[in-house]
Regions:
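Bacterial Sec-dependent N-terminal signal peptides
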Residues: 18-56
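Catalytic centers of hydrolytic enzymes
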Residues: 57-58, 67-70, 92, 126, ...
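Acidic/polar N-terminal loop/beta-strand segments that form early-domain functional surfaces
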Residues: 23-25, 64, 102-104, 380, ...
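Bacterial N-terminal signal peptides that target proteins for export
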Residues: 2-10
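Bacterial N-terminal signal peptides
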Residues: 11-18
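Acidic, metal/ion-coordinating pockets
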Residues: 53-311, 355
Length: 506
């Protein structure tokens, strides 16, 4: 994309309404705002008077969460420059205002994913952010990549409850806290990730790690902050306000003045007498959150989230504008084919399933697979976006299927609709052909992704029973990942100038 075209998109007006989609939908949750807690002097107002800094005795810290690589501005995402510009345009912002991240920064787009978040990590040096809590998707490329990106960052990666099984300790490269000096006021920042989110990470990526729910790890980090002179301490937590781990933290009565949250892609704000104030600022560059503190007392005075408008890109720093444009211009656009019609999450998922089905048929022509002998299966949450009418490129495919999941065959599985499409009692997957109406069991091969190959979801997805799983290989003899499966299917369908119609996958 040319710089002039990028800037025209970045400077166009895109106002988010309160129910605008963030993936499947933004969620706005505000609870208990009429009950300030003991450690706050909250205003909780969006009025101009209260958005201005009252005097020199206040400072504001900002948080972003679940950015998911949305560097480039599009019709759906405001992009990195608008996010920085919106924060810098907030009346509470000063050059001393720190910015933190609550995780899930890298995974989600081709521009960020082509080098597994390294370039985005460097861009965030210039954003700048002061610390980043690890999210579950930071582990998508393995812990070695986290450490590699940490070496490129001028800010620490935080996760107090990350434990290495072999040592029973937190890895040396990951810190549990940092103390920020904000014009003479010392603020402790502790980072953590939801303990139950371990199940959302491919098991092979975290074989030697676990996420502890022991709140003593957080308590020890608070003590370290206080020993280093922190007058107040906050938690940057990659987790939803209603999660089991967050509730455990709340019940533990830890001395956090506030919690910046993430993971659920929501706008959440909660405040009451009995809890630590919690705020989450949306996702995908479309929002942020903040807390304002008194330098005199260390009390939390204001907490809120803010929608981002794409026109705020004009407030971004020239240095970040130049580096962002240079990065985007350096990434080639590869066109695989063309589509027409109205795409949504459902028909995009159906397309991916048929791509998997086609890949299995092509790999094993001797099996003569039909919809009576083969079923394709993919988890709903693994499809992260939707196609759009027009060119189908490397960037759009990466938005839909950003994970390095290997396509896998499970031979001779006994299945019905419940075994395939649910996890417990909840809808979890979609299949092709649609198995939701299958009430009687049948024996079929399953083509799926290795992330799902586990006894934890269904007996049908066992990696070993009755026969071992088989990873598909591409023409080079390498593991055939879902991104390449989708890209190759688009190229196959669009040969000889054919156009893919979204309606064919409804």
């Amino acid at each position: 994309m040319k710089k002039t075209f990028l800037k025209s998109i970045l400077l166009s007006t895109l106002t988010l309404v309160s129910l605008f989609s963030c993936g499947d939908g933004f969620k706005f949750i505000i609870s208990g705002l009429d009950k300030p807690s003991d450690n706050t002097e909250l205003k909780n107002s969006n009025s101009d008077d209260q958005n201005n800094i009252d005097d020199k005795n206040e400072f504001t810290i900002f948080s972003i969460n679940d950015f998911h690589g949305k560097i480039e501005a599009t019709s759906a995402y405001n992009g990195l420059l608008a996010l920085q510009g919106a924060i810098r345009g907030n009346p509470k912002y000063t050059e001393d205002s720190p910015i933190v991240s609550a995780g899930d920064m890298w995974q989600g787009t081709y521009v960020s994913g082509f080098d597994k978040g390294e370039s985005l990590t460097k861009l965030m040096n210039d954003f700048p952010i002061s610390a980043m809590a690890l999210g579950n998707h930071e582990f998508d490329w393995g812990f070695s990549k986290i450490e590699s990106n940490q070496n490129k960052a001028n800010y620490p990666f935080l996760c107090a409850n990350l434990i290495q099984k072999s040592t029973k300790k937190r890895p040396d490269s990951i810190k549990d806290h940092i103390v920020l000096d904000i014009d003479g006021f010392k603020l402790g920042v502790v980072g953590a990730m939801g303990a139950e989110l371990e199940s959302s990470i491919k098991s092979s990526r975290i074989e030697d790690f676990e996420f502890s729910n022991d709140t003593n790890l957080l308590k020890n980090a608070i003590t370290s902050c206080e020993d280093e002179g922190a007058k107040s301490t906050i938690l940057v937590l990659h987790d939803d306000k209603d999660s089991t781990y967050t509730n455990t933290i709340q019940r533990s009565k830890l001395n956090f003045k506030g919690i910046f949250g993430g993971h659920s892609h929501s706008f959440q704000l909660e405040q009451s007498n009995s809890i630590i104030p919690y705020v989450q600022g949306g996702c995908d560059s479309n929002g942020y959150s903040y807390m304002t503190f008194s330098k005199t007392t260390g009390a939390l005075k204001d907490i809120n989230y803010v929608n981002v408008d794409s026109s705020m890109a004009s407030n971004a720093t020239m240095d970040l504008i130049q580096k962002t444009n240079n990065l985007i211009d350096s990434i080639p656009t590869i066109t695989y084919g063309t589509s027409t019609g109205r795409w949504n999450k459902t028909n995009t998922t159906n397309f991916v399933l048929q791509a998997m089905f086609y890949a299995a048929k092509k790999k094993y022509p001797d099996k003569n697979y039909t919809t009576e002998t083969l079923v394709a299966l993919h988890n709903n949450s693994g499809i992260r976006g939707k196609f759009t009418s027009g060119e189908m490129t490397n960037k759009t495919v990466q938005t839909v299927s950003p994970f390095d999941n290997v396509v896998t065959i499970l031979p001779n599985r006994e299945v019905n609709g419940t075994l395939l499409e649910t996890a417990g009692s909840k809808p979890y997957c979609r299949s092709y052909p649609n198995s939701s109406g299958w009430t009687t069991k049948r024996t079929m091969d399953i083509v799926t992704i290795d992330y799902l190959v586990s006894d934890r979801y269904s007996a049908a997805l066992s990696p070993t029973k009755p026969t071992p799983a088989i990873n598909l290989e591409n023409d080079k003899g390498e593991d055939y990942i879902i991104y390449d499966v989708v890209a190759d299917y688009i190229k196959y369908l669009c040969q000889d100038g054919n156009v893919i119609n979204a309606a064919d996958y409804n």
